[in-house]
């Protein structure tokens, strides 16, 4: 019953329709959740620039927050934020073992308090999502970019791989495309790099034969590709 936040690239590892998922687009709420926690389990993430390097004020100060970091690459452990406990392990194997252990301790956990906290977060998600979706009422010309990802999600079938290429274009796409199926997002989020979308879309099509791919490109990214 712990809330789950992700990096931008990690979106969809837990479907954002799950009650425990905190959508990455709600940045203020993500910061609140990360500050509320006295213990953070970081799995397969280096806590890079899109995670504010795990530092205050977007995260609780390390003196007030313990961190367990799990990664298969030892160079990642503790690189950007001191880890209270560093675990060199495969994420899937670690989480399976952890789930088994926690199940045996469930009777000793104060789940009611956790469920109330999660319910509070869910109410904030509904409220903030409604504010964002007000952009979709804007029918002006030129088009509000919020419509692009929103309409694409309506047109393409569930499970379509989304490729977002372009600085602000990728941000808008993340804000208005809900990740409902794991492993269906492909982009280059570090420092807003441009021009990789075409190759990523082709790669996604090859990796998942017969599955549709939606590639949203903007901010001049298409011009970078042929260069």
Where are the language model's segments positioned?
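Glycine-rich, anion-gripping cofactor-binding loops and their flanking helix/strand elements
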Residues: 1-68, 180-211, 225-227
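Active-site diphosphate/adenylate-binding microenvironment
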Residues: 122-210
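Short gly/pro/ser/thr-enriched loop/turn and capping motifs at secondary-structure boundaries
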Residues: 10-15, 48-49, 74-78, 84, ...
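Conserved acidic residues
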Residues: 38, 84, 160
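Terminal amphipathic helices with adjacent charged low-complexity linkers/tails
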Residues: 77-120
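Active-site metal-binding loops of divalent metal-dependent hydrolases
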Residues: 45-46, 218-220
């Amino acid at each position: 019953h712990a809330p789950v936040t992700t990096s931008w690239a990690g979106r969809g590892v837990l479907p954002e329709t799950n009650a425990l998922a905190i959508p990455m687009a709600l940045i203020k709420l993500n910061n609140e959740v990360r500050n509320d926690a006295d213990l953070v389990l970081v799995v397969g993430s280096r806590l890079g620039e899109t995670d504010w390097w795990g530092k205050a004020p977007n995260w609780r100060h390390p003196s007030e927050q313990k961190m367990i970091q799990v990664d298969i690459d030892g160079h990642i452990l503790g690189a950007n934020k001191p880890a209270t406990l560093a675990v060199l392990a495969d994420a899937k194997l670690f989480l399976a073992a952890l789930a088994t252990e926690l199940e045996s301790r469930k009777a000793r956990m104060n789940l009611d308090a956790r469920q109330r906290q999660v319910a509070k977060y869910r109410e904030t998600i509904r409220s903030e999502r409604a504010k964002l979706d007000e952009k979709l009422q804007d029918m002006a010309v030129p088009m509000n970019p919020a419509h692009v990802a929103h309409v694409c999600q309506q047109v393409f079938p569930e499970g379509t791989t989304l490729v977002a290429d372009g600085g602000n274009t990728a941000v808008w796409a993340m804000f208005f495309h809900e990740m409902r199926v794991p492993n269906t997002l492909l982009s280059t989020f570090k420092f807003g790099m441009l021009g990789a979308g075409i190759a990523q879309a082709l790669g996604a099509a090859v990796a998942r034969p017969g599955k549709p791919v939606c590639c949203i490109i903007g901010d001049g990214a298409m011009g970078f590709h042929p260069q």
